[in-house]
Amino acid sequence: MRLSAIVLALALTTAGAPAVAAETRPLRVMSLDQCGDQYALALAPGAALALSPRADDPDSWMREAAAGRRRVRPTLEAAVGFRPDVVVRYWGGDARLLARLEARGVRVVTLADATDFDGVRGNIRAAALALEAPGRGDALIARMDARLRQAAPATGAPKRSALYLTAGGFTAGPGTLVDAVLGAAGLANLVRAPGFAPVSVERIVLWRPARFVLSFFDQSRGDWRGPGRHPVVRRAAKGRVVARLPAASLTCPAWFAADAASMLKAAG
């Protein structure tokens, strides 16, 4: 009887071992693009992460946190090999990959193209829920809101107008997160047409905005011959640049867009 009891105890212990291992296994999170990388790194730093190849590029806000992390291409083969529990994406991954992931029961979080800070809050909550990190999500929203309070103009302060311009010669009007960033810092957007649009060198010369907010000029290898870098544009903007926002602050509809607003405020 004593031997039978020992055998039964060993059998129960062995049977329970895989279940315990499964419960303690780190969450496996795969990101399909650079924006997904930011959310995965911020909300699930303790997870087993498979990040996109662009996770540590100069225009990645969380590039330092990405150091030493696994990188994979956003392919079906990579997903099959990694076996993620959750996939985070903004635009990455083709229809075939997404269909196969969902068929396998993988949770796929698609970040919305947020055009204001309420939309960013929605992205954070959706990603935090899928990544089982609601507390981290709340902390991230609180951090963003604190930055927005820092950026907010004094009550009654007049709004100054400014033109947002990238090195590639693009600007942004209403219905974009850039417009929300300008507004959060108390700046009135000179562009009234919605969405993103190119701005010609000739128009800038004739228009001669009183203030410029420049962005994506820190990417020395990107758009190095773009209209925004034209000598005539440089002369038009001389002495009129409110701030130069780093590309990393505006590459993704995420919480660090509030840092861009705070930079504008700090630049005066």
Language model features with spans:
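Boundary at the C-terminal end of the N-terminal hydrophobic targeting segment
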Residues: L8, A19-A22
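Alpha-helical, coiled-coil/dimerization segments enriched in small aliphatic residues
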Residues: P53-S60, A65-G68, T171-A197
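Structured C-terminal subdomain patch of bacterial secreted/periplasmic proteins
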Residues: L27-R28, L32, D118-L129, D138, ...
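Flexible loop/hinge segments that line or gate small-molecule binding clefts
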Residues: L98-A126
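Short beta-strand->loop
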Residues: R89-W91, T110-A114, L163-G175, P246
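A short, structured surface patch at a secondary-structure boundary
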Residues: R28-F82, V86-G92, A193
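Basic- and aromatic-lined ligand-binding clefts that recognize polyanionic substrates
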Residues: R25-L43, G135-A185
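Bacterial N-terminal signal peptides
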Residues: S4-A15
